[in-house]
Amino acid sequence: MSINAFKHNIPDKTFAKLNTEGEFTRLAVSPGIINKHYTPEQFQKIAEIIGEKGAIKYSTSYSILLSVPTIEVSRTIKELEQVGLFIAQQGSIVSMKACDFCDGDKMEAAAITEILYERLVGIEVPKRLRINMNGCASACYNAVYDDIGLVYQKDSFDVYLGAVPMGRHAQAGELFAKKVPVQFIEQLLQAIITCYQSHSRKDEPFHKYYHRTKSADYWQRLIQ
């Protein structure tokens, strides 16, 4: 066993600790929606920005979380974007992540992924709604464990809804629609989002909303 595996279990700086000393903002940073590979220049820029004043944390959402002074957020975002880094939007909106399409070997779904990102990400919803796109049937980035899971295969998508991503009741989403043609997937997702906006309770997470209402007639009408 490596001597460093458990040598430093409690970090010196966390987002919570930093906010006891001043006002900090957390930025979710990655090389992009599909690309998962950082460059040395990007890591150098991250280290330069954070220095001794902030904090860096790995997350399970394929991004690095940077805690930076709130007064420096605008400048920080500009510097990160100049080296090709992507900063995810925060808040109660539709968000998206994707697999790496086998590091670019299976790019069939890349074009529709970009279209869906441009059309859907940022739409306001009752609680943050996570769409996870996987580019082949292997689904090795666990699309079925997000609010809306999309698994691409042969010009179509299987759509999974209502996963409980964590906790003792964690479970995969249910197969809601099978082999939805690429040309209809945006329309279906827009309809699902509209249902969530229209019929959810205040601050109700998508998985609770879906399991509470999945017997409602409007769900069946979406896939007829």
Predicted regions and their residues:
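N-terminal basic/disordered segments at the start of proteins
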Residues: 1-45
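Membrane-embedded hairpin module used as a gating/binding unit in multi-pass transport
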Residues: 52, 203, 207-224
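Residues that form generic nucleotide/phosphate-binding pockets
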Residues: 49, 79, 119, 188, ...
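Short, flexible, solvent-exposed loop/turn segments with mixed acidic/basic and small polar residues
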Residues: 16-23, 52-58, 164-165
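Alpha-helical structural motif
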Residues: 42, 72, 112, 185-188, ...
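Mobile "lid/hinge" segments at catalytic clefts and subdomain interfaces of large enzymes
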Residues: 135, 144-207, 219
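Small-residue-enriched alpha-helical segments and adjacent helix-cap loops
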Residues: 26-27, 31-154
